[in-house]
């Protein structure tokens, strides 16, 4: 099961006593701030959680899996996430 933005808002409502509207707005603002920072080329560092970075990927050769035809994969910018040590440690101990 995946954790959704609606789940995050529900947790804020239940655990912190936010109104449902405020909880939803808080989650939306949080993710909008991350989006804006990345759109402006900034790194996003969430202490104890991890970092979101932008990485430029060069053009590279690819292949159409149906036809086998060689096609170029265009250069692009991608978002990467590197988990922090605390998050890694907690996840590694789960089984």
Curated annotation (Swiss-Prot):
InterPro entries: Hist_DNA-bd, Histone-like_DNA-bd_CS, IHF-like_DNA-bd_dom_sf, IHF_alpha. Residues 51-71 are annotated as: Disordered. Keywords: DNA recombination, DNA-binding, Transcription, Transcription regulation, Translation regulation. SUPFAM superfamilies: IHF-like DNA-binding proteins (SSF47729). One of its GO terms (biological process) is DNA recombination. Residues 53-69 have a biased composition (Basic and acidic residues). One of its GO terms (cellular component) is cytosol. One of its GO terms (molecular function) is DNA binding. Heterodimer of an alpha and a beta chain. Belongs to the bacterial histone-like protein family. This protein is one of the two subunits of integration host factor, a specific DNA-binding protein that functions in genetic recombination as well as in transcriptional and translational control. This is Integration host factor subunit alpha. It comes from Vibrio vulnificus (strain YJ016). The lineage of its organism: Bacteria, Pseudomonadati, Pseudomonadota, Gammaproteobacteria, Vibrionales.
